[in-house]
Amino acid sequence: MTKFRLNSAFLGLCFATSLSSTSFADTNDKLEHFISLSLEDLISLETTIATASKRTASKAPAVISVITADDLKATGATNLTDALQNVPGIHVRTDAFGNRPLVHFRGANATQTLLMINGNSMRDLIWGFGIFWKGMPVSAIERIEIIRGPGSALFGADAIAGAINVITKTAGQIKHSEAGVRTGSFNTRTAWMQHGDNWRGIEIGFTAELYDTEGYNPLIPVDRQAAFEDQTFASNATLSPGNAQYGWRNQDVRFSAAKDHWRLQADYTRRSDLEIGLTGFGVLDPVTQGNDERFNLDLFYNNDTLGKHWTLDAELRLQHLSYNSGNGFQERPPGYTDNTGTYPDGLININRSSERSIIFEVSTLYSGIKDHSIRLGGGHTSQDLYSVKHLQNFGTAPDGSDIIAGSPLVDLSGSSYAFSPEKIRHINQFFLEDTWNFAPDWELTAGARYDNYSDFGSTTNPRLALVWQTTNKLTSKLIYGQAFRAPSYQELFVETSRALPNPDLNPERSETLDLAFSYSSTKNWLVNLNLFYFDQSDLISRITVAGLSKKQFQNTGNYTIRGVELETHWQASKQLNISANYTLRNPDSSSAPIQKAKKEAYLRTDWKLSSHWNWNIQASWIGERLRGANDTRDTLAPYAIADTTLRYAQSNTWEFAVSIRNLLDKDAKEITGRSIPGDLPLAGRNAYAEARYKF
């Protein structure tokens, strides 16, 4: 990786913005202390992810978690996924391919998580989270709202186990302009800025961040090439022992403008020079440097005074996504040998493609019936996968013949052997929901959403939520919901070296039942307890089918998980806050590709040492992880990782912070398949220092 360079235009913009906005900084503002919210503020915190209107998390018709910008600062999070790891029921698993952070809810696969940024799904048509997914910088985040449980009745596809909506800092929310820099381990360097203004009655918001890192490079003693291929074919092509290289760059720019009922948002994200470290097969790849870019343009209209009992919301979203593997994935190293011969350049696989989506949705809220609030609406989505380019020097040629070992790259684009066909998917959706206050302290929410897909059919997903304000200290909820995951293009249409597609697939399904309690015995102590039953069906996996030469994607099997999520918040004093959570999952005996930990725990303390100093300590414990079916390796041992962040705010302008991650330098590993026998080592002790200036 080349070293980080601050773009001169970026610095110039920071300087110009500081000159133009100094007058907007209120020098009489109180000094902000970046610790977790007081318990009173936490209880009254309102969310919108579970309903059309604002509700406190305890009264929302779902199991809700909220992470604020203050939480992000206090804990030293620099990426979205740093913060998600601290939520009960969520585990962020590091994937060996590209060091991607994959978000798992309640022991489900990451493909069953819906992640949105300002309501825009971050999923793509082929790879789920995206082949080069790396999270997002926290400098642009205002808050994160999370549903632990099904979300398809609200958001449609993929919210089987949970839904996350990241709300960025937009027009009207940025009260101070800010510029900051951060430097740390692994030659990591970051610069960011944000600016809010009002121009001729139009509220303007702007954020930008540049990021560059060489990444932590874990030692892989034995990769798949050494463990399997070299053993099978008596060769010595492996690059192990060797380091998996995980460097990458990121540029993130976001603009918003708002006036009256209208809001415009434009986001651009580019990840470049992204080293994948290990291929999807678990083979060291020091060559690949991929990149992707995403552009979103969103227009929103909101009118809460359309009529006496009516509101109107409309949105039009345009999205573009493209990615490519640069000079190609080195699927196997130079000198690789199999029963077809020897490949002097190794196995090279070049992928490029683009996607564009157009989404229109309109909804209204009617409150003209006593004690009822009825929301209904619908919309249309068009998703177009185009510009698919695929070249490789192995496998099957477009005419169905074998590509001879040692051949140059062959263009598979447009053939049935390309990694994906160029296709357009159309989705029509309709939703209806009623919230009924049928008695004092009782509220029933009932609704459903219908989605019709042009390539696999339709699905309807209901939800019911009964919320009872049991006492002035206790809130009880009983929640039922169904959800689905749409089959990906790869599962429906693409033949790979490992599996055949199946155009007759049904969506994966789930049914979830939650029993939740929120109890606040005093103003200083809050306890949340959630019991859940999570049943999945029609799971899509590769299985052997009689008469076929390869495994094929099929709907097969059920998987049930029962669990408990317990969390507590204690404001011990005005200076000290303590919070903790514990998750227990009890899956059935069904096999899963990679098992998740059954037990997880988290502890956090925030201590305001003085009017200028704040100190955060947090620790995460991940229990032992069972191996997948046919994996005879020992169970992977538990690990605990502690982080600490010390922040100093000199005035309402300057702030400084130092953060140490994996403070005790624990030897922690992420579970992998058998292709990486020693699993994936996680980063050891690392640190960063940052400075930010408000104006």
Label each region the model flagged.
Residues 26-73, 110:
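Short, acidic, small-residue-rich periplasmic hinge/interaction motif at the N-terminus
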Residues 49, 53-65, 81-124, 142:
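Extracytoplasmic beta-strand/coil segments of soluble accessory domains associated
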Residues 121-148:
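Short acidic/polar hinge/loop motifs at secondary-structure boundaries
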Residues 165, 173-174, 182, 194-290, ...:
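Periplasmic-side early beta-strands and strand-to-turn transitions of outer-membrane beta-barrels
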Residues 196-198, 202, 207, 251-253, ...:
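Conserved C-terminal beta-signal and adjacent last beta-strands/turns
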Residues 288-305, 419-426, 482-536, 545-571, ...:
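Outer-membrane beta-barrel signature, preferentially recognizing the C-terminal barrel domain
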Residues 355-357, 365-385, 395-398, 402-407, ...:
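Structural signature of Gram-negative outer-membrane beta-barrels, strongest in the C-terminal barrel
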Residues 437-444, 527-535, 554-629, 664:
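Gram-negative outer-membrane beta-barrel transporters
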